[in-house]
């Protein structure tokens, strides 16, 4: 099968760090056929500088009218996602959209309904499902090394005492740290544990740099109630803009062990430094950041447990190419669905909305199905 003719909408960091490198790394699967670049001229174009043969459009309607384009990758600010995704679907294009998907649950639901009615793929770029640290924690939980998990704490922290001034810092729908990083951490949580019963959150401007209504710090707790054969579970997802030094990534506690991991997945920094996803060292974590495990054997006297065995766990190599391979498989097989299911995207939207309500009201918000 010929490579899927792909158009990329957007010329910012996300397009050139999180999308173009993987399209380039998979030439048998995708062709970078077109780009939407509003300020391009006949002599100056960011997309053409990276891909000399790319067809550059300055008008979106003209790009969407190109019948050769099969897949549209949307790498634009979230406040325009609803409009642009709608246009692409109505033009008969399959769509891969950056996260955060839309500012509201209602808009997200409308778009998935539209894609279904037109028998088109619509998926959201939750690439951090393929972070090495997450894959390592996921495997550790699923193989039972920790027993039953009762607390799962996940962080992505930064030390940034200023606002960068991009879409994430402007008081528009879909802005702020919860939509930016929280959408990833919540997606990872529901991938592991499903739908929580309720949400308790605190969102704030930690740095007190205007606009103060755009949060730069959050702590969101997803509550899972005890059920028959299952203990209660709290999933805590956090991010801070004032965190200096080696940052904690995961603390996971279970009935048979604990998992502690420092350091963030290296892929973003590697891509920023110009490393190709084809490089043998791509996605490989530093041994200094390997997780520490404390585990107990399966059959113990709970009244007199032995001292836990401490060990170091090598990080599974992360690889965002896997998401693009899923996209290719979905289009080739005509299933039009990746592992990021529509109901999961909608659940993330619902949890984010509940987190804002919880923080504003200082109460827990039940999460109805």
From Swiss-Prot:
What is the enzyme's class at the highest EC level? Answer: oxidoreductase
Q: Which family does it belong to?
A: Belongs to the Gfo/Idh/MocA family.
Q: Which GO terms describe its biological process?
A: NADH regeneration; negative regulation of transcription by RNA polymerase II
Q: Does the keyword Oxidoreductase apply?
A: yes
Which keywords does this chain's UniProt record carry?
A: Oxidoreductase
Q: Does the keyword Iron-sulfur apply?
A: no
- Name the Gene Ontology molecular function terms of this record: kinase inhibitor activity; nucleotide binding; oxidoreductase activity, acting on NAD(P)H
Q: What is this protein called?
A: Uncharacterized oxidoreductase C26H5.09c
Source organism: Schizosaccharomyces pombe (strain 972 / ATCC 24843) (Fission yeast)
Give the enzyme's EC designation. Answer: 1.-.-.-
């Amino acid at each position: 099968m010929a490579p899927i003719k792909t158009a990329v909408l957007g010329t910012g960091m996300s397009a050139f760090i999180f999308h173009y490198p993987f399209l380039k790394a998979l030439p048998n699967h995708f062709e970078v056929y077109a780009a939407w670049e509003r300020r391009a001229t006949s002599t100056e174009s960011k997309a053409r500088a990276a891909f000399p043969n790319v067809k550059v459009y300055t008008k979106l309607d003209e790009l969407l009218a190109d019948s050769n384009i099969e897949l549209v990758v949307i790498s634009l600010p979230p406040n325009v996602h609803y409009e642009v995704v709608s246009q692409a679907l109505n033009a008969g294009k399959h769509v891969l959209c950056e996260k955060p998907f839309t500012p509201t649950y209602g808009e997200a639901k409308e778009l998935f309904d539209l894609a279904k009615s037109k028998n088109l793929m619509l998926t959201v770029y939750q690439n951090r499902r393929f972070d090495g640290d997450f894959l390592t924690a996921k495997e550790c939980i699923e193989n039972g090394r920790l027993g039953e998990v009762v607390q799962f704490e996940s962080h992505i922290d930064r030390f940034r005492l200023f606002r960068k001034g991009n879409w994430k810092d402007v008081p528009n729908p879909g802005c702020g740290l919860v939509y930016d990083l929280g959408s990833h951490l919540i997606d990872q949580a529901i991938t592991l544990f499903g739908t929580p019963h309720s949400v308790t959150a605190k969102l704030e401007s930690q740095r007190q740099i205007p606009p103060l209504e755009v949060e730069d710090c959050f702590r969101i707790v997803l509550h899972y109630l005890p059920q028959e054969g299952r203990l209660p579970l709290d999933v805590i997802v956090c991010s801070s803009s004032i965190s200096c030094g080696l940052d904690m990534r995961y603390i996971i506690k279970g009935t048979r062990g604990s998992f502690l991991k420092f350091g963030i997945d290296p892929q973003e920094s590697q891509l920023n430094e110009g490393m190709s996803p084809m490089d043998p060292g791509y996605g490989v974590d530093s041994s200094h950041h390997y997780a520490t495990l404390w585990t107990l054997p399966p059959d113990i006297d709970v009244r007199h447990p032995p001292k836990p065995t401490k060990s170091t766990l090598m990080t599974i190599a992360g690889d965002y190419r896997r998401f693009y391979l899923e996209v290719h498989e979905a289009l080739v097989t005509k299933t039009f669905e990746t592992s990021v299911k529509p109901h999961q995207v909608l659940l993330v939207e619902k949890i984010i909305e509940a987190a804002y309500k919880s923080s504003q009201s200082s109460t827990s918000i039940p999460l109805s199905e």
